[in-house]
Structures are given as structure tokens and as C-alpha cells.
Amino acid sequence: MEGLVVKNYAGFYYVDTGKAIYMCKARGKFKKDNIKILTGDRVIIRELVPNSEGVIESLLPRKNELIRPPIANVDQVLLVFAFADPFPSTELIDRLLVMAYALRLEVVLVFNKFDLVNPESQKLFEYYKKILPKVVAITARGDTGIDELTDYLNQKISVLAGPSGVGKSTLINRLVPGAKLATGEVSPKIKRGRHTTRHVELIKLPFGGFIADTPGFSNLTLPEMDKLELQSYFPEFNQNRKYCYFPNCLHVKEPNCRVRELLETGEIPPFRYENYLTFLEEITSDERSS
């Protein structure tokens, strides 16, 4: 019987077969062969107690695997930020975008708390909407943008990530009535929320698909990559690199650089270029130290 591991907790694996959720142990061969079963894995189980307990017999091939958070077979990442309270960090948005694209994952960028939108955050939202295929404004405590978001989530395994206090748990409670996840209110003193998620669990969406509220991405170190690779994760840089004089242009000091021309005319905002330079320096430092 095939199923999906939706939770790995206290030595038990909870496997959703579509008809029931089985509490399972894994056969000894997995430990012997040092094979770790992750949330998101598709497995074959043998039923021990009808619709209740089973044993994991085999692990099906993975499409992908994330280390932090430890989860397999992810289709896309939902990056959740807020229009305000807390105001979005563009450095964190861009860092998470690069990390997701480097892992070959699709991205849905969500701006929550639309009721708190201000001119500055609206401008940010509009720019990202121009350069990315899936950007949506929502109010997790209301209806704004929820239909559009459910279309993106339908029949996919999605990982939820973003800073604390932006409404990730509130969003899951909105999408899955009865989930009753703890919510982290924003501290008025530091304008950040309390972390409320302890382990990785896939929550079944009523309209199809699964969503994980994760404790990560706790490690925000960029994955290993070549300097030239970085710009491929900045769509507006990647689209214009062919117009640069040098084919291997890094858009730093090279003459006749199309990206820097667009920066000067305001078509590329300074924050995007500054974040690109920050990441490029990180990659360069890593190359020097290796």
C-alpha cells in the first residue's frame, strides 16, 4: 500500500494513504543501511491494524530533498512576508529566492496583511510582481487573495518559509480550518514574532495538496555556486545579461554593462543590486576560503 509520510515524530512515521493515516515503524533494514525516512517521502507500507497501524517496507525514489528543513519531494516554496508589522526585509526575500531557485524549486511569494499596506511596501510588491511569475497579496484573517493562493497550492507539496510574525500559522489556520496552529503575535518592542513551529509536518489541504509549516529555512547560508550562476537567480539580471559587452559580465565594474545601465535609469531598484552585490561577495569569499 503506497502512502505519503506526513509526520515523523518520536520514532513513528505517520503515513497518509489517501484513505487513512497509519502510524508506522520502519523495518530494521532502513537503520541498518543508514537510510533516513523524511516527511514528504512516498513509501510502501504493510498494514498491521486496519486503517490504523503499519510497517514501512520500502522507500520510493525521491524527486528532491531539503536538508533544513528535512523534507522530501517538495514542489514549491511559499515565501511569506508582510506588507507591514514587520516590514519586509528585501535582503531576506532575495536570499530565500536565491536559495529556492538554486534548489530548483518553484516559488510563490506571498505578501500578507494587505490591510496594513503602505506606499513603500506596495512599491516593493509591485516590483516583485513584475519580475516573478507567482506573487500574491493576501489577508490571512480575511478573504483577500485567498482564491488566487489556493490555485497555486492545489495538488502540490508546498513548504512555507519566512520570518516570524508575518502570519504563517494564521495562514495555515485560514487554509485548513481546524488546524489550530499556535500563532506568534508580533512583539511590540522588537517588532518580531515568536517562533511557534517545532517540527516538520505536512498538513492536508481541503482542496488538494499538502503544506508544511517548517522551522526553517534556519540556515540562511547560500548554497555553493559559481559567481556567474548567481545572476541566473535574479530574473531581471538574467534577461539582460546578453546585452552586456562581456559575455561573463558580473555587473560590478565592467564597461558597457546593461544591468548597471538599468540601475541608473531606475528600472532595476538599488535594493536588488545591493543584495546581488552582497551575495556575490559571500560567494567570492567562499571561493577564496575553499
Swiss-Prot record:
Binding of GTP, residues: N112, K113, F114, D115, G162, P163, S164, G165, V166, G167, K168, S169, T170
Sequence ranges assigned to domain CP-type G in this UniProt record: 63-220
Cross-referenced InterPro entries? G_CP_dom (IPR030378), NA-bd_OB-fold (IPR012340), P-loop_NTPase (IPR027417), Ribosome_biogen_GTPase_RsgA (IPR004881), RsgA_GTPase_dom (IPR010914), RsgA_N (IPR031944)
EC class of the enzyme, as a word: hydrolase
Q: Where in or outside the cell is it found?
A: Cytoplasm
Requisite cofactors: Zn(2+)
- A GO cellular-component term linked to this record: cytoplasm
Binding, Zn(2+): C244, C249, H251, C257
Q: Which GO terms describe its biological process?
A: ribosomal small subunit biogenesis
Write the Enzyme Commission number(s) for this entry. 3.6.1.-
Supply the alphabetized keyword list: Cytoplasm, GTP-binding, Hydrolase, Metal-binding, Nucleotide-binding, Ribosome biogenesis, RNA-binding, rRNA-binding, Zinc
How are cofactors bound according to the entry's free-text note?
Binds 1 zinc ion per subunit.
Pfam families per record: RsgA_GTPase, RsgA_N
Q: What is its main location?
A: cytoplasm
GO MF annotation: an example: GTPase activity
Keyword Cytoplasm part of the UniProt annotation: yes
- The answer to keyword Transcription applying to this record is no
Assembly and partners are described as:
Monomer. Associates with 30S ribosomal subunit, binds 16S rRNA.
PANTHER family the record matches: SMALL RIBOSOMAL SUBUNIT BIOGENESIS GTPASE RSGA, SMALL RIBOSOMAL SUBUNIT BIOGENESIS GTPASE RSGA 1, MITOCHONDRIAL-RELATED
The UniProt entry, under HAMAP family, shows: GTPase_RsgA (MF_01820)
What name does this protein carry? Small ribosomal subunit biogenesis GTPase RsgA
Underlying gene:
rsgA
